[in-house]
């Protein structure tokens, strides 16, 4: 007699089950959405404040920085050692300009010590004109120790220690060096003497007692005490004079 209530009760069961299913599905959706929002917000915070990632990031930074510094220091030390080695063995390193105020090649002594054509250490006009050998008088090409065209220790054009036509050992007009102890090439024991004001054995700047390669007291290429082709101690064409 109450059997007609069974379909009514089943209807309510289906309605209640459907409503419960919808409510549970809504709750599931809310939970899913909240999980997505929570994950989106928590992921950066986890990366920033993670007890694992934060120390790992710091350690990685220090390791990379230390490795870079070590490599840079190693390369610098190797380059410095190589530079010092090259400098030690005398190889000048490239791209190393001289410091400011350092002397140049033009400032070094002896770089411009002589005029054009002179030998090192000679100045034009001191001991010889440009191109002359040291100690030669004007009239380039003469050997040192000789006056212009004359033998060493004599006046211009005269023999050693004597004027043209005069006795060996006497200057023209009785200049100093006449008697014993006279000019080069005169009597024994004669001091090397030339023209007035001359250095020992020749004109100013000449070497004493003759040019290079000449015998002492002789004219150019001559024997001691005589001119080329003349008798010893005599004037041109004259007889041998006795010692005074």
Curated annotation (Swiss-Prot):
It holds the Pfam family Oleosin. The keyword Secreted applies. GO terms for molecular function: lipid binding. The keyword Transmembrane applies. GO terms for biological process: post-embryonic development; reproductive structure development. Its main location: secreted. It is found in: Secreted, Extracellular space, Extracellular matrix, Pollen coat; Lipid droplet; Membrane. Residues 124-204 have a biased composition (Gly residues). Lipid-binding oleosin involved in tapetum development, especially for the physiology of tapetosomes. Also implicated in the formation of pollen coat. This is Tapetal oleosin GRP-16. It comes from Arabidopsis thaliana (Mouse-ear cress).
């Amino acid at each position: 007699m109450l059997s007609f209530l069974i379909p009514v009760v089943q209807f309510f069961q289906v309605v209640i089950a459907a409503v419960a299913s919808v409510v549970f599905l809504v709750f599931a959706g809310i939970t899913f959405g909240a999980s997505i929002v929570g994950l989106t917000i928590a992921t950066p915070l986890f990366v920033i404040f993670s007890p694992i990632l934060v120390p790992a990031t710091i350690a990685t930074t220090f390791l990379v920085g230390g490795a870079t510094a070590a490599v840079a220091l190693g390369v610098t030390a190797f380059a410095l050692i190589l530079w010092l080695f090259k400098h030690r063995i005398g190889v000048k390193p490239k791209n190393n300009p001289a410091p400011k105020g350092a002397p140049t090649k033009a400032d070094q002594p002896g770089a411009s010590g002589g005029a054009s054509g002179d030998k090192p250490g000679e100045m034009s006009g001191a001991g010889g004109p440009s191109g002359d050998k040291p100690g030669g008088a004007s009239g380039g090409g003469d050997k040192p120790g000789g006056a212009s065209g004359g033998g060493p220790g004599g006046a211009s054009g005269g023999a050693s220690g004597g004027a043209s036509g005069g006795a060996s050992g006497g200057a023209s007009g009785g200049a100093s060096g006449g008697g014993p102890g006279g000019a080069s090439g005169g009597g024994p024991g004669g001091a090397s003497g030339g023209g007035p004001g001359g250095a020992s054995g020749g004109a100013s700047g000449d070497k004493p007692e003759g040019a290079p390669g000449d015998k002492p007291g002789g004219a150019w290429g001559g024997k001691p005490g005589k001119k080329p082709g003349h008798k010893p101690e005599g004037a041109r064409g004259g007889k041998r004079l006795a010692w005074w």
